[in-house]
């Protein structure tokens, strides 16, 4: 529900919960992303049908996102994610502040050149696989902060996430095999039920309100992550 409506937080929230129960980071990320194949697919189709997708932006994010996902999934099996997480959290915290700041002044909708979208997609896919989530927070928050329309940004990022997730899961399967089936089934059922409703909410809520919600969510999650890394 949160991910489909705001374009983020599904993987981050669930991975944090799974890690707190003692599940290893690689297993948690693989489980969440396997479930996300179904939830992001459902969410992406819903956004597409409701006209929330910018096809040009979608094509520019797709390939770099998939490449970043492959690299991130591979590294997760060998390097502790705690080393990188604080830096991602600081970046997201800054993005959240920028988004909130822009809600209180006039924003001119704009587009981002392909040259700048490639590294954004690459970084988003990389940290998404590495930390069990991050595609939405990194890509959505950056694009909205740059002035992109929140509705089309969220819908487009959600649709692209399906293909990025599919690539990440394929990489995880080749390296470590199938993750825990019970975890995956539980995540799939809850996510698929909520996805269509989330796309409808995204279409109905005004852009300014969406930006405020996105900004607060990013800041909250970032502060929480930074605090956890300091313990």
Regions found by a protein language model. Give the residues of each.
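Feature detects amphipathic, helix-rich regulatory segments
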Residues: 155, 168-171
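A short glycine-/small-residue-rich loop at the edge of a beta-strand within enzyme catalytic domains
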Residues: 129-134, 157
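Transmembrane helix-bundle signature of multi-pass membrane transporters/permeases
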Residues: 29-37, 154-162, 192, 218
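Accessory recognition modules or surfaces
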Residues: 5, 40, 112, 162-163
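Short acidic/polar alpha-helix capping motifs at helix-coil junctions
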Residues: 36-37, 102-107, 162-164
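Juxtamembrane transmembrane-helix boundary motif
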Residues: 1-5, 9-21, 25, 46-131, ...
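Hydrophobic, membrane-facing alpha-helical anchors
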Residues: 33-45, 93, 133-142, 164-167
């Amino acid at each position: 529900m949160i991910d489909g409506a705001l374009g983020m937080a599904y993987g981050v929230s669930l991975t944090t919960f799974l890690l707190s129960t003692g599940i290893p980071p690689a297993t948690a990320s693989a489980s969440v992303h396997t479930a996300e194949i179904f939830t992001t697919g459902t969410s992406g189709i819903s956004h597409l049908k409701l006209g929330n997708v910018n096809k040009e932006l979608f094509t520019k994010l797709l390939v770099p996102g998939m490449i970043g996902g492959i690299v991130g999934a591979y590294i997760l099996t060998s390097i502790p994610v705690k080393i990188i997480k604080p830096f991602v959290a600081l970046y997201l915290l800054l993005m959240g502040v920028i988004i909130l700041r822009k809600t209180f002044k006039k924003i001119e909708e704009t587009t981002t050149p392909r040259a700048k979208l490639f590294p954004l997609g690459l970084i988003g896919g990389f940290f998404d696989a590495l930390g069990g989530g991050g595609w939405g927070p990194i890509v959505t928050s950056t694009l909205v902060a740059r002035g992109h329309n929140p509705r089309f940004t969220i819908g487009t990022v959600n649709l692209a996430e399906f293909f990025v997730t599919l690539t990440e899961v394929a990489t995880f399967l080749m390296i470590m095999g199938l993750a825990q089936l019970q975890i995956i089934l539980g995540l799939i059922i809850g996510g698929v039920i909520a996805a269509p409703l989330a796309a409808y909410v995204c279409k109905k809520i005004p852009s300014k309100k969406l930006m405020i919600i996105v900004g607060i969510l990013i800041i909250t999650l970032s502060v929480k992550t930074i605090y956890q890394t300091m313990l």
